[in-house]
Amino acid sequence: TDADWAKQVLKLTKRKGADLVIDFLAGSLFNQTMSVTKIAGTVVNVGRMAGETGEIDFDQHSMRRICYKGVSFRTRNPDEIATVIQAAKQALIPALAEGKIQLPIDAIYPFDQFNAAFDKMKANQHFGKIVLSL
């Protein structure tokens, strides 16, 4: 991970912050996530890689008027899950294909080293995707 990620986001957005933040981290990093969210922006939490709990700066949350949504498949039925997946495919695949969205790749492992890749992921030592090559 890059300790200066918040500074990088603010630099890229000319200090305005992002309209939408897809948050895989939460936990102890949530206040940093709010700091890079545009005023009246939205944070959608889809993971808790930095912890399931943490302190929240409610003043920052209120002052920035951030809309926060938590997302989990654990409480959805199969039809809801299928609908979400289909909508994500329609929105994300074209954006990925056109280069509008780029996914950071942390590491590429040969398939026969999948245990090492899994260990890295389990230890939360990556920033971005871990790819297995065939």
PLM feature spans:
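Adenosine-nucleotide cofactor-binding segment
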Residues: 1-29, 81-83
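Conserved functional loop/turn residues at catalytic and ligand-binding sites
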Residues: 13, 17, 25, 60, ...
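C-terminal capping/lid region of NAD(P)-dependent oxidoreductase domains
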Residues: 15, 98-107, 115-134
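Glycine-rich phosphate-binding loop and adjacent beta-alpha segment
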Residues: 28-100, 133-134
